[in-house]
Swiss-Prot record:
Required co-factors: Mg(2+)
Main localisation: cytoplasm
Gene: pheS
Any GO MF annotation of the entry: magnesium ion binding
Protein name: Phenylalanine--tRNA ligase alpha subunit
Length: 327
C-alpha cells in the first residue's frame, strides 16, 4: 500500500508542476496507460490473499480516480490560461474609428432601365434584344425610312459599308420580332444605340428603350393611357403630360410627349405613334387586320430629368464622386 501511496503522490506533484498540455498527456500515459505505474499495481493482486484483494483493488481504483481528477482539473486550467493569453494577444480596441466598407452600386442608367423594364413587365411586355451591328433593311428600309432620309446621312450614322452600320435605334429588334413571331405582340427593346453626335446633351453612344404593341383593334387612346401611367410612375409625381403632333416615318399618326418641369416649362421625354401600315407590310403582317403602337425613349435623358443631372456626358466619365451619389 505504501508503494501505491508514493506513486499517487508523485503523480499529483508532477501534474501540478506541469505547464504544458502535451506533457500532461505523457503523464497520463505514464501513470494510467496500459503499462502505466498505477495500472501495473494491479499485477500484485496475484500475490495477495483472498482477504486482502478487495481492499487493495479498491485502493488502486481510488488512486486512478484521484490522478484522473487532478489531470482533468489541470488540463482545464491550462486551456483557460491559453484562451486568456490568446484573447489578450488578439484584443480589439473598440475605440478605434471604423473602416468604411465600399459597397458597389448600380449605375444610374442601369437603374433607369430596370425601372422601365419593371413597369412594362407588369403590363405584360417582354424584353427583347438584338444585334448592335445592323443591316440597312432592319435599321431603315423596314421602318419606312426612305433612301434619301436625313437619318441615313454619314454625319448621323456610323457606317461599316453602305449596307452595314451601328444601329441608330433599337427599332430593328421590333422588326426582327415581328418577322419571327405572330401577333399579338407586346415587347420592349432596351439597348445601346449609336449616332454621330457629341455635346452637352448628346453622346455617340447612348441607351434607348423602344416599345411595341401589335394586336387587333389597337388605338391611340391605349397608347396615351399607358405612357401617361408610365411617366407618373417613373417620376413618382402626378405630372402634367401633353401629346404634341409630330412626324416619324415609322408611325402615323405620330406624337412627341412632354411633361411639365418644375421650372414651368415643357420638357420632351419620348416619341410615339401608331405603327405605319408600311412597317407592318414589310414584315408580313396584314395592316387591315392588325394595328399597333410604338414608342421610344432615351434612357439618359430620363435619367437626367429624374436625378437632376445637367450634363449627359457625366454618365460616361466614370467619376466616382458622381457615381457614388446613386448608391
Amino acid at each position: 500500500m505504501s508503494q501505491l501511496t508514493e506513486i499517487v503522490e508523485q503523480a499529483l506533484a508532477a501534474i501540478e508542476g506541469t505547464e504544458d498540455l502535451k506533457a500532461l498527456d505523457e503523464l497520463r500515459v505514464d501513470y494510467l496507460g496500459k503499462k502505466g505505474k498505477i495500472t501495473d499495481m494491479m499485477k500484485m493482486m496475484g500475490k495477495l490473499s483472498p482477504a486482502e484483494k478487495p481492499a487493495f483493488g479498491q485502493a488502486v481504483n481510488q488512486a486512478k480516480q484521484a490522478v484522473q481528477k487532478q489531470l482533468s482539473e489541470r488540463i482545464d486550467n491550462l486551456k483557460a490560461k491559453e484562451l486568456e493569453a490568446q484573447l489578450v494577444a488578439e484584443s480589439i480596441d473598440v475605440s478605434l474609428p471604423g473602416r468604411r466598407i465600399d459597397n458597389g452600386g448600380l449605375h444610374p442608367v442601369t437603374r433607369t432601365i430596370e425601372r422601365i423594364e419593371t413597369f412594362f413587365g407588369e403590363l405584360g411586355f417582354s424584353v427583347k434584344e438584338g444585334p448592335e451591328i445592323e443591316d440597312d433593311f432592319h435599321n431603315f428600309d423596314a421602318l419606312n425610312i426612305s433612301e434619301h432620309h436625313p437619318a441615313r446621312a454619314d454625319h448621323d450614322t456610323f457606317y461599316f459599308n453602305p449596307k452595314v452600320m451601328l444601329r441608330t435605334q433599337t427599332s430593328g429588334v421590333q422588326i426582327r420580332t415581328m418577322e419571327n413571331e405572330k401577333p399579338p405582340l407586346r415587347i420592349i427593346s432596351p439597348g445601346r444605340v449609336y449616332r454621330n453626335d457629341y455635346d452637352q446633351t448628346h453622346t455617340p453612344m447612348f441607351h434607348q428603350v423602344e416599345g411595341l404593341l401589335v394586336a387587333e383593334n389597337v388605338n391611340f387612346a391605349e397608347l396615351k393611357g399607358i405612357l401617361h401611367d408610365f411617366l407618373r410612375n417613373f417620376f413618382e409625381e402626378d405630372l402634367e403630360v401633353r401629346f404634341r403632333p409630330s412626324y416619324f416615318p415609322f408611325t402615323e399618326p405620330s406624337a412627341e410627349v412632354d411633361v411639365m418641369g418644375k421650372n414651368g416649362k415643357w420638357l420632351e421625354v419620348l416619341g410615339c405613334g401608331m405603327v405605319h401600315p408600311n412597317v407592318l407590310r414589310s414584315v408580313g403582317i396584314d395592316p387591315e387586320k392588325y394595328s399597333g403602337f410604338a414608342f421610344g425613349m432615351g434612357v439618359e435623358r430620363l435619367s437626367m430629368l429624374r436625378y437632376g443631372v445637367n450634363d449627359l456626358r457625366s454618365f460616361f466619365e466614370n467619376d466616382l464622386r458622381f457615381l457614388k451619389q446613386f448608391k
